[in-house]
Amino acid sequence: MATVSTGSLIFIVKKNSPMMSKLVFFWQNREKEFRDFGGFSEKSVYFCDTIDNRKRLILVVINREVLLMTFDAIDQLAVNTVRTLSMDAIQAANSGHPGLPMGAAPMAYVLWNHFMNINPKTSRNWSNRDRFILSAGHGSAMLYSLLHLAGYDLSVEDLKNFRQWGSKTPGHPEVNHTDGVEATTGPLGQGIANAVGMAMAEAHLAAKFNKPGFDIVDHYTFALNGDGDLMEGVSQEAASMAGHLKLGKLVLLYDSNDISLDGPTSMAFTEDVKGRFEAYGWQHILVKDGNDLEEIAAAIEAAKAETEKPTIIEVKTIIGFGAEKQGTSAVHGAPLGAEGIAFAKKAYQWTHQDFEVPAEVTERFAQGLQARGEKAEQAWNDLFAAYQAEYPELAAEYQKAFANEAAQVELEAHELGSSMASRVSSQQAIQQISEQVASFWGGSADLSASNNTMVKAETDFQPGHYEGRNIWFGVREFAMAAAMNGIALHGGTRVYGGTFFVFSNYLLPAVRMAALQNLPTVYVMTHDSIAVGEDGPTHEPIEQLASVRSMPNLNVIRPADGNETNAAWKRAIAETDRPTMLVLTRQNLPVLEGTKELAEDGLNKGAYILSEAKGDLDGIIIATGSEVKLAMDTQEALEAEGIHVRVVSMPSQNIFDEQSAEYKESILPAAVTKRLAIEAGSSFGWAKYVGLAGKTLTIDTWGASAPGNRIFEEYGFTVANATELYKSL
């Protein structure tokens, strides 16, 4: 029997059997049994109902030690401070979403001030901090209020400038823009997949670096989502993956308010969320009253006690709690107005000024989140110092992994006369990079044999083998890319993922978010053209190149042979603040003359002269990928007729666009207007390089089902046609 005394309360753990115990307490000589919140174990949670007007008490059993947790009026004042700061910021901006902050503030407060191990003084520099993602990014005013109260570099003045030009408080959270924000969110559902990626990274790094007595990677990933997030397909893909992977340190707090922008969720969302997530392999916990701080805390403890399953805590809330129109879509996405705010503040019994933070709330955050975070980080620093002494090589590798420095690798060159698909030369590069960059890992959306993404002699990332470097994302392209974003945001690894290029459409929203967040993810997109052949137009990319090239801050590289593929991978792995998309062939490509010597420098400038004209320059043929060989053959045919042309390989338009005016003029002189671009994709975007006087040999229709070489012939990708097209200039 274990006894814990706190004031006039005495708590006793009674062991009824070796496997079972129950908690009782004596209050004025009356015995009251605590309700079991999940079954007694080494880590369990119990709570009892209110007794004699006392607030409900929570007992937490951790390693059979009993801890007391309770909440008081200051905690409730802190919750209301989060609400009022959010309301005031939205009103000042005359723009924003008050419903979520007003309804979800209790769960967010309990999580932040009573559970999360974060240190505002060091912000995102402490690698073992807990992570929090606001997947429902429209609730950003709540996040900013929490960040301010927690002590991050976010002032009341910043809250007053919510959604204004140049402010630290944009409409949706942006990483690297606002101190303490872990991920850029807003497009619903993606934040959940980001959280899955972060939990994957935590599990992988823990398996790789932790040693007995040295759990240097040991943190939780929390995300807050709403009904809309769960309607999005990407959240379902990600939840399925997380359940399979048994990511026990992943916890979703579900703001279940039954309201969407259009009205009640009953109009479109009536499924059994509990049943769905349990089918995925998750633990589901229901909190019936979203204003009950004790019940929320008990649920979070129960979530942390489950180590074999991710947990979704469904918290039943009232959207816009306290507002005159609470519980309706009217409070979802528009300011309440002065009268509406006054009504809500009266409901909260709020007696302070606009944007005011009561001193006792500031003190409560100092005693809670700040003190706990500083203590936790100092304990981790001490642990890591001992780890460095015991495992110096691993410690150095850990520090290097989190430094996010450009990786430099050496790749074996491809010799003239050899031939292989660029997806195969990419696989060789992946293998060599994995041997030189220990933090490098990745996989494919169920196409590893086709994308050639698997690293040989490495284990698979699976439950019980989280050290594995081959990730099986399954047929979940969107979740793959969004989880990759979470992995990259977590830090400590370099991740890549592959699929067919035609399926890039499935994952572009996540690629966009990677580019927006400056994440150095790598996308291996194979089967890049009509050369796919027999599978037909559903699997033959046409518009994809033009689409991805239009995306800011994304390196799109379509290499012409093995040497350009090597150069592309070197560039990709050296990036620290930009994603890269490698567009690779299914069919074999011969190694071209000159690429061994010119490709690396040329690719890093986006375009280069691969073969100069043999006489006075008549014109220029520009090509990418598999069509560079056709350009070279066309040059030879034209040369036989006394027409001297230059062949420019342009593996990356966007990198070329970033070069100096002098370099671009040296490659594409303005005076040379006879230009032909050859690419097995859309003509869209090529006018920029060929000009009004130029022409393109491209494809502005759908592909066909036939052997790839036959399709190329039918679409005019022949030396004869290219020669005549050039001569028509």
From Swiss-Prot:
It comes from Streptococcus pyogenes serotype M18 (strain MGAS8232). Its EC number is 2.2.1.1. Belongs to the transketolase family. This is Transketolase. The active site is at residue 477. Homodimer. The keyword Methyltransferase does not apply. Substrate binds at residues 97, 332, 423, 450, 527, 535, 586. One of its GO terms (molecular function) is transketolase activity.
